[in-house]
């Protein structure tokens, strides 16, 4: 990937976010250890992160998000998940860095360019589980439905991850994705991050370069986690990223004061709230 200083497209956000994982991993009191993150991010990822950091984008939301997803993954594996599908997997290295069962099937789905880049960087590394990669534009609904059916048919209990994905989708696209996942009976859980309309508005202002790169932040439902209930998914775990970051001792004094406020659980549209939610299939 060539080196320039600004975000060009949505795939560049993976380089940017990997730097935050690298920075956390290099701390003496690191919450997690992603030893592959800096290599995956490369020089370009560092440039993008430095540019955005100058606009006061703190590290802690990404640390809290990563930690929360890790927790949901571990919980679901303990409960019997045998397959994980990571949609728009980007530069996530969990199959390499997490303690996972060797029998676990992990499927990463992303655009061909992203997968080719990632495979080249990690070519000499061995995953800790059964890792597969699928080159697919997730906007192709028929193809993704076929993929879900193929994977779901071979699984007893599947967890789907959409980390840093649905905020870029329209409301209609999120509805369609929720429907496509629900069709597969073996898909029991879905982990995703979610923004309130209040947070979405703030991020749109602070990260305007995303819109300039044709990667605008779009989705922040007024219903909060309840948005998914009519679509067959119930929020069984809600992790407020501010409060998680506070528990992990990653907040400045300024943010610690806000962390003391009551948690809206994403149900107050005007509140600046960001979280990670575990959605569990509502059996009909």
Predicted segments, located by residue:
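Short alpha-helix
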Residues: 215-240
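Short, glycine-/aromatic-enriched active-site segment of Class I SAM-dependent methyltransferases
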Residues: 197-215
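A short SAM/SAH-binding and catalytic strip from SAM-dependent methyltransferases
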Residues: 157-172
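Rossmann-like AdoMet
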Residues: 1-85, 89-136, 141-148, 154
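C-terminal lobe and adjacent flexible extensions of AdoMet/dcAdoMet transferase-like proteins
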Residues: 271-284
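Conserved catalytic loop of SAM-dependent methyltransferase domains
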Residues: 236-260
């Amino acid at each position: 990937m060539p080196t320039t200083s600004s975000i060009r497209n949505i795939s560049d956000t993976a380089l940017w976010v990997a730097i935050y994982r690298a920075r956390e991993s290099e701390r003496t009191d690191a919450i997690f250890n992603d030893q592959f993150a800096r290599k995956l991010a490369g020089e370009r990822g560092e440039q993008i992160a430095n540019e955005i950091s100058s606009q006061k984008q703190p590290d802690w939301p990404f640390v809290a998000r990563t930690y929360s997803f890790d927790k949901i993954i571990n919980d679901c594996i303990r409960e019997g998940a045998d397959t994980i599908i990571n949609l728009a997997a980007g530069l996530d290295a969990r199959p390499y860095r997490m303690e996972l069962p060797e029998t676990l099937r992990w499927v990463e789905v992303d655009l061909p360019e992203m997968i080719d880049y990632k495979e080249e960087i990690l070519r000499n590394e061995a995953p800790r589980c059964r890792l597969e990669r699928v080159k697919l534009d997730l906007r192709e609904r028929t193809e993704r439905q076929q993929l879900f059916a193929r994977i779901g048919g071979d699984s007893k209990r599947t967890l789907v991850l959409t980390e840093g994905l649905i905020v870029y989708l329209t409301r209609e696209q999120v509805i369609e994705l929720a429907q496509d996942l629900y069709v597969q009976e073996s898909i029991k859980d879905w982990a995703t991050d979610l923004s309130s309309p209040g947070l979405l508005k703030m991020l749109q202002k602070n990260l305007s370069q995303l819109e300039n790169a044709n990667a605008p932040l779009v989705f922040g439902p007024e219903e909060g986690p309840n948005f998914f209930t009519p679509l067959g998914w119930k929020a069984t775990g809600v992790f407020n990223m501010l409060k998680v970051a506070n528990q992990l001792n990653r907040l400045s004094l300024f943010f610690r004061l806000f962390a003391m406020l009551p948690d809206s659980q994403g149900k107050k549209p005007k509140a600046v709230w960001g979280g990670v939610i575990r959605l569990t299939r509502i059996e009909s």
